[in-house]
Amino acid sequence: MAEPITFDRDAVGQPPAGWTCGATGKGTPQWTVETEPGGTRRVLKQSGRAAFPWCVKNDIALTDGWVEVRFHPISGREDQAGGVVWRWKDGDNYYVARANALENNVSLYHTTAGSRQTIEYRDAPVAKNVWHTLRVDFKGASIRVALDGKVTIDLQDTHIQGAGKAGVWTKADSVTLFDAFAYGNAGP
């Protein structure tokens, strides 16, 4: 497994260096590196409000591989989501897998031409104010999503193909912390 990317060397109150942050749809995302409440380590926090805020690592180009992140849903009246994006071409074209503490489920979507479409969702316990790990393994049309080590979605889909960036994602008014972002190429 690759060494997880942390935000401990990034400036507090700013987006992380080497990442591009924005949103699909309307709104104003607020991606900043902050000191974890009650702790000393720095984490990435999304605290703005937008349809689908995302923040992608600039130097990634994965066709087949895996993406993993630790996320901590803090609050949100509409949503309390944390997710990962991959095969990200731009803010309107990518895959996303997310877990939602308000709905207690894990979902897989493709976003094409700025329109998010559900591929699959499954009920799963997602506690608020707790760190979780979300991982996606993808190779060709195969996509496997796991929450806290348990596979929740395992299917085939071909909506988004070819290499793309990877990063993190939230929804609506979710206030979510992210840490230990990791990624790698698929094995043989």
Enumerate the language-model features and the residues they cover.
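Short tryptophan-centered beta-strand motifs in secreted/extracellular beta-sheet-rich domains
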Residues: 7, 67-69, 129-145
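Secretory/extracellular carbohydrate-interaction modules
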Residues: 12, 46-112, 171
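Extracellular glycan-recognition surfaces and repeat-rich motifs
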Residues: 14-43, 48-51
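Hydrophobic beta-strand positions in extracellular immunoglobulin-like domains
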Residues: 71-73, 138, 183
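Short, solvent-exposed beta-strand-to-loop segments that form ligand-recognition rims
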Residues: 146-171
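Extracellular carbohydrate recognition
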Residues: 170-180
